[in-house]
Every structure is written in structure tokens, then in C-alpha cells.
């Protein structure tokens, strides 16, 4: 099983379709770079239809979920991409409805991981959903990855997703390198010390 440590350079050797049939829960730190860059289609090709916590995204633009809140502040091109993504509810993504058990887990994790997830309702919901439904989390959030590791929940972060995209021939290696280093990190300010490099067309996160 893939390690959930954010700081580790993990070699990915997963068959295409790895995510098929699995519960894949995405948080805002993954949705934002893929959607804002215009690559929401690539996220879908990699992971399929993702499940998203209600505090992270809502199909109603007026709601104040994490993803929605930036629409009013973003440059128009990015704002329109986010509005378009909201309209793809039921296709590219589905909003999760938390069960009573998951709500109990949210409160349990709120106390247990107070140091790492305080004030992060979206991350708490994401962790609870993935734990109860035996799912996988897509995130770039270090605190969430720490908590998920403690709960034996598998995580993938954006650089790893792009490595898989190259391995599965969804995108050329040079395009993935540019997308991650120049667009995600430099332009969209994704917080990451990692960079994606292509050596002999082999992608690596270092």
C-alpha cells in the first residue's frame, strides 16, 4: 500500500484504473489546482468521479463552502472555471452526505487532531468519510495527511496524481512537469516543497 507520508518520495507503480470502484474523496487543495488550471478533466481521468465533503464544495454557488468562497475573489477566468465545475455535480464530482456515524467521527477527530486540523471542517469531514467508507483521500494538506496516516487511510497528493497521469499515458511527461511546477506551484501558489521532474520521460516527485 502506498505510504500516506507527504514528505516521502514514493515510487508509484499502479495499474491504470487503480481508483475504479473505490471511494475517492478529494479536498479543496486538490480540486483547486486542477480546476483553476482548466485540468478538471484530467483529475476525472485519473481518479474518476470524486466524492467531496459538504464543507469543501456545494453545487449552489451561494453556499460558503471552501471551494465556493474563492469564486467572488478569483480572476474571472478562474471564477468561471469554478462555476463551470459546480455545474458538473453528478458528473465529475458528487457532494457527500455525512451519515450519523460519520458525524460522530468528525467530532472525534476534531478533538483527537486538534493540533493538526483545528478549524478545518472540510478536512475533518473528508477524513471521517474516507475512514468510515474505507476510501482514499486526495489532498495536499499536510495536517490531513498526518491524521489520515494515523487512521490508516491512504492518501495521494497532486504531484503523485500527475505521476500516475504520465504513467497511464493521460498526459505527456513534459506537460505534467510544466503543469505542476509552473502552473500549480508557481502560478496558483499550491504550497509544496516538491517538484515534478522528467528524466528520460520518467516522472518523479522530489
Protein language model regions, located:
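Long, charge-dense
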Residues: 158-172
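Basic (Lys/Arg-enriched) interaction patch that binds polyanionic ligands
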Residues: 139-151
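Short secondary-structure transition/capping segments
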Residues: 149-153, 168-171
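Short secondary-structure boundary/hinge segments and terminal tails
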Residues: 61, 147-148, 166
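Active-site-proximal, substrate-binding regions of enzyme catalytic domains
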Residues: 2-135, 142, 160-163, 177-184, ...
Amino acid at each position: 500500500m502506498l505510504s500516506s507520508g507527504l514528505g516521502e518520495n514514493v515510487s508509484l507503480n499502479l495499474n491504470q484504473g487503480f481508483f475504479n470502484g473505490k471511494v475517492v474523496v478529494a479536498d479543496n487543495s486538490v480540486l483547486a489546482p486542477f480546476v483553476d488550471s482548466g485540468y478538471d478533466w484530467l483529475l476525472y481521468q485519473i481518479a474518476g468521479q470524486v466524492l467531496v465533503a459538504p464543507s469543501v464544495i456545494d453545487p449552489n454557488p451561494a453556499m460558503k463552502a471552501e471551494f465556493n468562497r474563492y469564486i467572488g475573489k478569483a480572476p474571472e477566468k478562474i471564477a468561471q472555471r469554478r462555476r463551470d465545475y459546480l455545474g458538473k455535480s453528478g458528473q465529475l464530482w458528487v457532494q457527500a452526505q455525512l451519515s450519523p456515524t460519520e458525524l460522530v467521527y468528525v467530532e472525534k477527530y476534531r478533538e483527537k487532531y486538534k493540533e493538526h486540523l483545528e478549524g478545518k471542517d472540510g478536512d475533518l469531514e473528508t477524513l471521517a468519510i474516507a475512514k468510515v467508507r474505507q476510501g482514499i483521500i486526495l489532498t495536499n494538506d499536510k495536517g490531513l495527511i498526518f491524521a489520515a496516516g494515523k487512521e490508516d487511510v491512504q492518501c495521494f497528493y497532486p504531484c503523485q496524481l500527475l505521476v500516475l497521469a504520465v504513467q497511464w499515458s493521460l498526459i505527456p511527461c513534459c506537460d505534467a512537469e510544466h503543469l505542476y511546477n509552473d502552473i500549480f506551484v508557481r502560478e496558483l501558489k499550491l504550497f509544496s516543497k516538491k517538484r515534478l521532474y522528467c528524466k528520460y520521460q520518467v516522472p518523479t516527485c522530489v
